[in-house]
Amino acid sequence: MNAPVPVPRVADFTCEKKPASGSRGMVVTNHPLASAAGAQILLAGGNAIDAAVASLFALTVAEPMMVGILGGGLSHIRLADGRHVVIDNLSTAPGKATAEMYECLSDEIGKQRDTRDRQNVVGAKAVAVPGALKGWCEALARFGTLPLAEVLQPAIGLAERGFVVTPYLSNCITDNAGDLARDPGLAAMLLPGGKPLQPGMRLVQSDYAASLKLIAAEGPDALYGGKLGRALTDYMAANGGLIDQADLANYRIELREPIRGSYRGYEIIGPPPPSSSGVHITQMLNILEGYDIGSLGFGSTDAVHLLAEALKIAFADRAVATADPAFVKVPVARLIDKAYADERRALIEMEQAKSWTAGLSGGESADTTHVTVADAMGNVVSATQTINGLFGACVQIPGTGMIANNYMYNFDPHPGRALSIAPGKRVFTSMAPMMALKEGRIAFALGLPGALRIFPSALQAIVNLIDHRMSLQEAVEAPRVWTEGGVLELEEAIPEAVAQALIARGHKVVRSPRVAGGMNAIAFNPDGTLTGAACWRADGTPVAISGGLARAGARFTI
């Protein structure tokens, strides 16, 4: 990207972290040890795909509350030849799942997924068929260069040696201590003596290290047809879960073509349904393109108002039109059409917040992780993966160290809707592993955790970079806003005068200490260097690679 040009700002802020700069590779993840794992693989001769997979496995150790091999997600890959592919390894509903399997408690905005006894949140009945391990191994087999056993070594070592607990991890354990205490394995691992692990304590995961070694020897078959899979299905059968051996054997990843849109001279590329990000980020950018956003000033009343209205429009359409395309006909062409954006934009009122309904016919948890990796050959990976809620279903499969997802929470527990449960149906997601091109060359790649707040936050980072001319570090750390049609959340750095002006326009404003999770990103500069950035909302750390080998023919003499 070109150097940022200063533009007016109403909401001012100071970045808490510093970017990294490199020329031969960049790894940015939400934990420094995972970034180091990816960098280690790049230095060993691996490419960006090898490094991304190594980082993801390391994150299953260092961020056990966020991601695991029993989870799912999306990996957006740009290959050195310019091809883009999205690997969909999202979890699926078990074959025994039904649309009526949970007792619903509410249909209010924000409470639609509430069920009796939180059965779609904690426990065996909340677990969907995992896709993470198969997806990561498939990415490595198709596009990587190193064997799985080598790529797994950093994670195995991390699990065996242990690592120092960060305040962020300790806080996550504390926040979920009640649910964790109900599972013997997680209680022993995370609540020694009945108390949460504290910052500075060491977390060792011996059982999980053994599971990773088994995967290194047997590949994904260790889970989808072997010992680890039997441990999972035995636990499910004994505890009211639905996953069986047939579910594991029948699970398939999907290779998908990304959604492509345009915004002020950039090509914006993101994942297609069942992710909502590619479609609805494109839709919202099409709406915003009709305004001179940059001249309004970052964080101004008008700029925030337009973001809020665009978000409400997208969420209204998303609720009725976007789901697993194998089960629901998704009107992608209509949603990303600039003419449709013109129709929706014409209904926006600058001085009045509106309630929006869908313009056509037709819930997730915030606890996810993201990696962004680039190598010297031109391969780029933007991958978002999760076990869904904090520590997933708060279930550890005995003897394996594996933490199960609670992906069933992402379905609408009410029957007869686009997002209702059906056997084999892929979960719906807001994951937004995004990339942008300028004149055919990659300009930036980014992503973050945060559930329903993911794609709105990714949208804001794109607007920050293109309209507000922010640096990459500023774009990922800038204060965010969010709404799906109810309250309008404003992070604390948005000025109170702006909040009051938005209230006067009819917005239901609430303050939030944090909207979504820790974004990480890579910018590709005209001089061939890479800039990596991670934000204050997580333990994110960029690790850059520069330098290189000695000049050809160089000798050491004395």
Curated annotation (Swiss-Prot):
Record function comment: Besides the cephalosporin acylase I activity which converts GL-7ACA into 7-ACA; this enzyme displays some gamma glutamyltranspeptidase activity.
Active site per database record: 368
Family the entry assigns: Belongs to the gamma-glutamyltransferase family.
UniProt key word Disulfide bond: no
Domain of life: Bacteria
Species for this entry: Pseudomonas sp. (strain SE83)
Coiled-coil region: none
Protein name: Acylase ACY 1 proenzyme
